[in-house]
A protein has these predicted regions:
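C-terminal membrane-solvent junction of multi-pass transporters and transport-like membrane proteins
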Residues: 189, 342, 382-469
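Membrane-interface "cap" regions at the ends of multi-pass membrane proteins
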Residues: 1-69, 222-226, 245-255, 477-500
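Transmembrane helix-loop boundary segments of multi-pass membrane transporters
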Residues: 63-74, 145-156, 177-186, 289-298, ...
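Transmembrane alpha-helical segments of multi-pass small-molecule transport proteins
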Residues: 118, 146-174, 188-199, 229-240, ...
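Hydrophobic alpha-helical segments and their helix-loop junctions in multi-pass secondary transporters
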Residues: 133, 141, 189-214, 230-234, ...
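Membrane-water interface regions at transmembrane-helix termini and the short interhelical loops
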Residues: 64-66, 92, 108, 116, ...
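Juxtamembrane transmembrane-helix boundary signature
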Residues: 75-109, 118-133, 474-481
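Hydrophobic, membrane-embedded alpha-helices of multi-pass small-molecule transporters
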Residues: 39-56, 198-205, 214-280, 300-321, ...
């Protein structure tokens, strides 16, 4: 068996991952000698970019849904906490596998079943990319309109989106180290600007009582706001492996998890609470958060708000989304031989048209609500199943076997049944189906939502249902690590000894 090492074209120690240079590694296993990241970097990577309009809008929606300040505050707090716990479930995996979360998911779902994770994460990455590009473009045109009276029409918006996509593409092309350093720089700046939001809008703040609830009554609307808040940290779960794969396998999983959890929770929570606080000053415009915050902000805050909230943090998040999509595409059979940065450039062109279609030609808020509902109902059970598998195998993986899809004729530990773990797929499907039965949105109402007085429990039920079915199914079939095929590393060792 020749060239078993995934990414053998780049020898150990020869991969490039420097600030300002194009990263040469893809989804191949990162050699130990190249794993120079520290666990604390997960904090800065997932804290810094949260203070962008595309992420903050998830907090402003709590006010837009009709909640008062304190109800919105607690919905955001509870949602952020629970969503961050789901994020925590997949945080320790990538340092053990040396690759991203989508490829790592093959341990639970099978080497072919990993494509389920690819589909879910592509949906998330492209969805957020669209949101972030659109809100950055809005920030530009509304700020320039306030300063110079320029147009806010479709032409100006289209030009602004094109500019944002080009800048975003540069970050995604450069890759891991450049993105990590950028997020590190944003961390301190984001804390300062985030706190300035409270100062800038304090004179106009009022703890509005709410009452005009989007879903008719308080609790269904409160849970919708909590679900929206939870979706933000959950949406980052598939991305954590992009950065964790450069952390040494010897790093403590508890330390890795603690830094990741702290970064995602504090970043999402503070950004969304700040957005909700500001939105009380323009509650009637809260659905159009970018326009509302730009037009009602005091003059002294317009420039830092544009540079950090509208551009730097938003573009950093968008670049991370595009990087994730391009990195994962390298594991698709038709794109095995295409370089990551080539894929990133191609995706940028596609997203420009997609952004126009989804947010300009149609209703942005309706599409956003649909996106959140589908994303959280499908991603939560996927992440919970991966987390349970990690606990069952006690963090022990066979990294080479995860790359069997790239080795002709190879199977390995994670082959299961034809490359798919049926137990995991059934569990995920059961979780999604159960979750949709409890869904309560303006677009879709599940048949069981009336049993909980209209409260949307879709993502909670999806995660619980999928996790329970997977745990029971795995224990019953007694296949905690996977199938009966020998590890590829053992096969390689036998071949070497046989030719010696």
């Amino acid at each position: 068996m020749k060239n078993l090492e995934a990414g053998a074209a780049i020898g150990a120690g020869l991969g490039k991952d420097d600030f300002g240079r194009i990263e040469t590694r893809g989804i191949d296993i990162i050699p130990d000698v190249e794993r120079k990241s520290k666990p604390y970097e997960l904090f800065t990577v997932f804290f810094g970019p949260q203070f962008g309009y595309g992420n903050m809008i998830f907090g402003a929606l709590a006010i837009a849904f009709g909640l008062g300040w304190w109800a919105a505050f607690w919905a955001i707090t509870v949602g952020s906490l629970v969503g961050s716990l789901v994020f925590l479930a997949v945080t320790p995996i990538s340092p053990k596998t040396g690759t991203n979360n989508q490829v790592s998911s093959g341990a639970a779902f099978g080497v072919r079943g990993r494509l389920l994770g690819s589909g879910i994460t592509w949906f998330i990455a492209m969805g957020f990319f669209v949101i972030l590009v659109y809100t950055s473009a809005q920030a530009l045109i509304y700020t320039f309109n306030r300063w110079f009276g320029t147009s806010t029409g479709l032409g100006a918006l289209s030009i602004a989106m094109a500019v944002i996509i080009v800048v975003t593409c540069v970050g995604a092309v450069l890759g891991h180290r450049s993105l990590e350093r950028g997020d590190r720089a944003l961390t301190i700046v984001s804390i300062i600007v985030g706190l300035l939001v409270f100062i800038a809008f304090a004179p106009k703040f009022h703890a509005i009582p709410g009452g005009h609830y989007l879903l008719g009554t308080f609790w269904p609307t409160w849970f919708l706001a909590a679900t929206t808040a939870a979706s933000l940290p959950i949406s980052w779960g598939p991305f954590v492996g992009d950065y964790g794969r450069y952390i040494p396998a010897s790093a403590s999983p508890r330390v890795v998890g603690a830094y990741g959890f702290a970064g995602i929770f504090l970043g999402c929570w503070l950004a969304m609470v700040a957005a909700a606080f500001a939105a009380t000053a323009f509650a009637a415009q809260a659905f159009n958060f970018v326009q509302g915050i730009t037009t009602t902000s005091p003059a002294w805050f317009v420039l830092p708000m544009l540079l950090i909230l509208g551009l730097a943090s938003n573009i950093a998040s968008a670049a991370m989304s595009l990087y994730n999509a391009a990195l994962d595409a390298g594991a698709w059979p038709i794109l095995y031989k295409v370089k990551r940065w080539h894929i990133a450039v191609g995706l940028s062109a596609i997203v420009l048209g997609l952004t126009y279609l989804l947010v300009v030609a149609t209703n942005f808020i309706t599409n956003l609500e649909s996106f959140v509902t589908i994303m959280i109902a499908t991603a939560t059970p996927w992440m919970v199943i991966m987390g349970i598998h990690y606990l069952l195998v006690k963090g022990q993986y066979a990294p080479l076997d995860l790359h069997a899809f790239a080795i002709p004729g190879a199977r390995g530990r994670y082959w299961y049944t034809g490359g798919i773990n049926i137990v995991a797929f059934v569990a995920w499907g059961c979780g999604v189906a159960l979750g949709l039965m409890f869904s309560t949105t303006t677009l879709f109402t599940g048949p069981l939502e009336s049993s909980v007085q209209g409260v949307d429990l879709s993502w909670l039920m999806a995660g619980l249902g999928g996790g329970i079915v997977y745990l029971i199914g795995t224990l019953v079939t007694a296949r905690r690590t996977a199938g009966t095929q020998p590890d590829l590393a053992d096969v390689a060792a036998q071949e070497v000894s046989g030719t010696a």
